[in-house]
Amino acid sequence: MVLPDIKKGKDMINILPFEIISRNTKTLLITYISSVDITHEGMKKVLESLRSKQGIISEYLLDKLLDESLIDKDKGKEFLITTGVINKTKTSPLWVNSVIISDVPHLFSNAREQWKCDGVFVSHIIDIKDNNINVSDSTLIWLHLENYHSDIVKRIYSKFESNPGVAFIQSYYLKESFRIDGVYSPDLGTPCHFCHIERWLSREEKSFRRNEMSWANLLQLLKKYQMTLPALALGESERGFSYHLIKRRLQELTGTSLVKSHVDNFMSSVSADLITCILCKEPVIHWQACSCLER
């Protein structure tokens, strides 16, 4: 299966989340950064149109909406930017496409449509069992596993890491935590999954010494007997929480980010405690025993 390129054009407009509340003759615009009373009937029509198109649209389409409502284009766009309804993007994304490869592909059956409003464009959802996976250059590959095994990650890496511009990000479950690695980009030389996991295992070994019940020993045992590590007691709410975190991370990396991102976020891992719902971000550096820098 060869996946086609899906490219975003230049001079695109990000439509950010907003709401319009109308009662009698009063119309209130509410965004993350402001709340404004809207009296201009033409602007009300523009906002209603934009609300139905949340995500990314061309600047040409926005100009057309403003023209139809007899609103000066420059002043109209300035108002929408100032109030937090839109922002502009002219920079090219690092990745043209993003795909999700998973052992639970049904979990993402609605993601392609649902996530568009956040500027997240996933070209394909692929079952890990598919032996005929091919991806185009400049693709971000998200590998999501409910049954973790390091060999699965190695197989995906070895198949695609020589493709120009391809990068990887993994999500999986360990103990009571849902984990999302930082982005591994062979082109940029960022740390890979095994830099993340080996550093975590090293901490486990130091904490539990040679305790046979440690998770480090359990992972080594499962690896020896070619067994996967299943997620513990996952229900619909835990899956929904993980699904939301995946969407937000993809939005931060490829979509319409709601916050300004620092370069450290690119390399940071995310760990979410499924019991306490506490979220932690941690920058990850290369693990000295990992060979990803030599690949």
UniProtKB/Swiss-Prot annotation:
The keyword Plastid does not apply. The keyword Cytoplasm applies. GO terms for cellular component: cytoplasm. Transmembrane segments: none annotated. GO terms for biological process: antibiotic biosynthetic process. It is found in: Cytoplasm. Keywords: Antibiotic biosynthesis, Cytoplasm, Plasmid. InterPro entries: McbB. Necessary to process the inactive microcin B17 (McbA) precursor into the active peptide. This is Microcin B17-processing protein McbB. It comes from Escherichia coli. The lineage of its organism: Bacteria, Pseudomonadati, Pseudomonadota, Gammaproteobacteria, Enterobacterales.
